[in-house]
Amino acid sequence: MKVLVINCGSSSLKYQLIDMDGEKVLCKGLCERIGMESSMITHEANGHKATTPAIFPTHTEAFAEVVKKMTTGEGKCINDVSEIDAIGHRVVHGGEKFKSSCLITDEVIETLRELSPLAPLHNPAGILGIEAARKVFGNIPMVAVFDTAFHSTMPPKAYMYAIPYEYYEKYGVRRYGFHGTSHKYVAYKAAEYLEEPIERLKLITCHLGNGSSIAAVDQGKVVDTSMGMTPLAGLMMGTRCGDLDPSVVNYLKYTLNITGHQLDEILNKKSGLLGISGVSSDKRDVEEAAAAGNKRAQLASDMLNYQIKKTIGSYIAAMRGVDAIVFTGGIGEHDAIARAKICHHMDWLGIRIDTEKNKHPQGDVCEITAWGAKVRTLVIATDEELMIARDTKEVVENK
């Protein structure tokens, strides 16, 4: 089975074609600046990668160009679009309506529209991509894979906010969690590496990048996660503030005399590592500035590492123990200094990492546990596209 994985933004289209017999990537690419004059497509297949200008008034034309790239020229990876057996779409927010991946129907699209207020920056773009793909690919089965679905096993005591209950009943105000596809992939990958059924494991998965979240996975089910109703909550991130005293919102709004939209921009795009350091939203730049003596950059780094350590500790308490901690994402996979600082002084919990292994992790799964430590510590390269493809294959085969 060949599965085309799609991740649509408002002006972008990321794709990957995977042959599920061996889970081999046949091609991948990115359409950028859709709807703008300077739109382009980057396509990679057969060891050949090229970026070419193109005209994409809408996502429909972008999909048509993707088909052209896949079936002709140096980037050809299939003879005809009919070779694609299924299409998996990443959808950010499934609310309480979608607790697992599902076949896309007219009714599903309508429900996604109803959920758009919960993810106004992401869900409309996902719907746009689904509708454009239907025009280009016709009757090829399509599956929606939700970022929120893996977290749907959280109990009410973990997902409810302590505000009037009717706001949950009427408006769906609660914790949902995100990065679920990544958390699911690395949790199952960890279980495979540890040679234990996931149903016997207590795992803490740390997806750390420009957007970051942590999940407590007990016996294969998420029991808590750091992001909330939106991806703004939890840890501080590249440009997002993370958890905040709700009264700060009103205080800033009236003190600065700004609109709710303007404040939303500040909290989502001007805060986090960027807001504290004043240097960059990129952790690498922040660490470089900190090493050069920039105190604000050092503070930003210290804050993030502290918040991650604190969250890990709270989840160990919630699960009454932990078997393994998994680091993934841009920071989680590549920032040895961050991993070392996060795990420092956690010996009393059984967490201790090997300094040399931590400096140079090798392969898709690398264990950096120090000799004698009770808790296993792993660095795992996430693969959200493959997880989406697996879910898509499972849904289509069981329809």
What are these regions (language model features)?
Residues 1-4:
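Extreme N-terminal starter segment of soluble prokaryotic enzymes
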Residues 9, 89-92, 208, 322, ...:
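Glycine-rich beta-strand-to-loop/alpha-helix junction loops that act as flexible
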Residues 12-56, 228:
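Short glycine-rich, Thr/Ser-proximal phosphate-binding strand/loop in the N-terminal lobe
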Residues 70, 74-122, 143, 149-158:
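Short beta-strand-loop/turn "lid" adjacent to the catalytic site in phosphate-handling enzymes
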Residues 150-254:
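Glycine-rich phosphate-binding loop of actin/hexokinase-like ATP-binding domains
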Residues 218, 224-256, 265, 329-360:
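Catalytic phosphate/nucleotide-handling subdomain of diverse soluble enzymes
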Residues 265, 272-276, 283-318:
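Adenine-nucleotide phosphate-binding core of ATP-dependent small-molecule kinases
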Residues 298, 302-318, 323-326, 332-398:
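Internal helix-turn-beta structural module
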